[in-house]
Amino acid sequence: MAQMYFYYSAMNAGKSTTLLQSSFNYQERGMNPAIFTAAIDDRYGVGKVSSRIGLHAEAHLFNKETNVFDAIKELHEAEKLHCVLIDECQFLTKEQVYQLTEVVDKLNIPALCYGLRTDFLGELFEGSKYLLSWADKLVELKTICHCGRKANMVIRTDEHGVAIADGDQVAIGGNELYVSVCRRHYKEALGK
Amino acid sequence: MAQMYFYYSAMNAGKSTTLLQSSFNYQERGMNPAIFTAAIDDRYGVGKVSSRIGLHAEAHLFNKETNVFDAIKELHEAEKLHCVLIDECQFLTKEQVYQLTEVVDKLNIPALCYGLRTDFLGELFEGSKYLLSWADKLVELKTICHCGRKANMVIRTDEHGVAIADGDQVAIGGNELYVSVCRRHYKEALGK
Amino acid sequence: MAQMYFYYSAMNAGKSTTLLQSSFNYQERGMNPAIFTAAIDDRYGVGKVSSRIGLHAEAHLFNKETNVFDAIKELHEAEKLHCVLIDECQFLTKEQVYQLTEVVDKLNIPALCYGLRTDFLGELFEGSKYLLSWADKLVELKTICHCGRKANMVIRTDEHGVAIADGDQVAIGGNELYVSVCRRHYKEALGK
Amino acid sequence: MAQMYFYYSAMNAGKSTTLLQSSFNYQERGMNPAIFTAAIDDRYGVGKVSSRIGLHAEAHLFNKETNVFDAIKELHEAEKLHCVLIDECQFLTKEQVYQLTEVVDKLNIPALCYGLRTDFLGELFEGSKYLLSWADKLVELKTICHCGRKANMVIRTDEHGVAIADGDQVAIGGNELYVSVCRRHYKEALGK
């Protein structure tokens, strides 16, 4: 029975590396994984999953209008898929997370989703909210705060490194925009 | 460093039993745990945590207005607390979940929260939403669907056992109102 | 696909309570679980699993000569089993753990095993060794050291509470014989 | 409080990639991790941790005589260590695993150990045995069997791909020597 996994973490934990390693494991055994990532994330070029550690692979793109069930079904009918891997899954919509449960339940294809848990205001992204609600397995990928404790929150900083407490949920950026911190230092940075 | 745990499950998985066992473990070592439960849940009498398997213990009550940080701090100052255990934590508000992070971060008291993940419409309760967002550890307590697979969703049924797809989020009830099922049988029961 | 779980912990973590709750969950859905425990453990009467919190249930017994595959197969043929629950699984032999993998792999019956990880000398029991080797899922049931940290080791004490560093691996006893402690206090108690 | 983690898996699951990503996470925050690997493993050159996916880093070497506590303490005194990462940890001796618990308990440095669980005969390696006994956290890194299920066992094959049921525990090799499989196909391959 296929299952849906949500691998969640703060930023810079190595989600994309873990995704690419899983994909490698499937291919190494002659299997056919399909990789998707958010069209919104053009940090490293469109249609690519890249990890800061130096790995990358081609990826299908999804945006808010994509019907991921249909897209995956089409790929599966062209060539049997053994697994789908979704990077930046926090950018999925509620409907797309539901479509992914159908990929798992109806097409019996495992879905491994990798993404952030909360935004810089500590609120769930829509995709994360419904993955946390419906996924079979919730697995935390760990990274560390500057204090050495586990980091599970994300601060958005301005160009002076000062934490920002308002603004749009999404402003794609690498290290210079976001910092992963523990809950204590998150509160401290936002003066809570 | 104290941590916040969210022990989540569908209904009838033994959350209260697990809570009572943890409390027992602390007391057995001469430590002082405090138990809280939702005032809304009067199935087994007010101010009590009871498990269907036959265990029960006195519990402090919280409702939407309770400041759980103040309530716990007061108890802690009267007699050092080694842990707080929250049953029916899905009924916490966003603000109360935040107050609990302060109990953990500022008073360094571990908080073990036990509750449902999603309601009969597959939506997160407010308490579950913010525990899934901010807790240090997410631990699933397993129970089974009638088909033998893991149950991670909840159906609300009418007196004829037919699944209901509308109504208030909360209608406190035991086996006769709610059934825990796997995702596939959840969809089937709601004709999805 | 059935799986083999090893729920391990130090002493007094509530393993038997957790086992009895799982059994209750299966029965509540009209399913048929079978409970086994070690004949060697006569603390609460033979053929019974009891938890210090006050719960108990009848149990089939196994000793070193029992062929658990045959015993389970016989029960299964008499009335379909949905799950087997093994208490005190540290007392299983290597061969019996292998037989349990056959119950899972050949009879497709889930096996939930509950037991200690290491003895008072920090060495694995034979049953624990092969469950740690072959089980599909390793799940820790937590309990606490007198210092508040997680307890993952066990000290055997004499009647004066002084830790003992030699003697037979097995001397069945309750609180008065054994104390669960964290690794640091384990080393301290044994003067390491 | 530092903890000891044992990241275990069958072969070709990406243990080295995960280790290198953890190391990268620490360095990215200006911290100083130390990497160790077994001198016995010269597949990719001595003193190097390499992952099949194309990543590598310098590593300190340990062999059966190395006192890892002294080696780490020396590094720590030269420049504060924030974490030690041990690859091929199955090749540690019992004494070396104990020394690592002292690194965690006495020097308060987290130890992340990555390695195999069982050998081609289904028996624990010495290092794995004592990590499974004493580690604070046991985390499984997943890979897949040719049948699509999770692989948790390892077959050693001859040049014709036929499973071998005897021979030394250690014969360092890549894909051509070892294949990770699920328990069912492990038994099948060895004619059990």
From Swiss-Prot, chains A, B, C, D:
Q: Which UniProt keywords apply?
A: ATP-binding, Cytoplasm, DNA synthesis, Kinase, Metal-binding, Nucleotide-binding, Transferase, Zinc
Q: Which InterPro entries match?
A: P-loop_NTPase (IPR027417), Thymidine_kinase (IPR001267), Thymidine_kinase_CS (IPR020633)
Task: Name a GO CC annotation attached to this entry.
Answer: cytosol
> Tell me, what is one Gene Ontology molecular-function annotation carried by this entry?
thymidine kinase activity
Record text on subunit structure and interactions: Homotetramer.
Q: Which PANTHER family match?
A: THYMIDINE KINASE, THYMIDINE KINASE, CYTOSOLIC
| Name the record gives this protein | Thymidine kinase
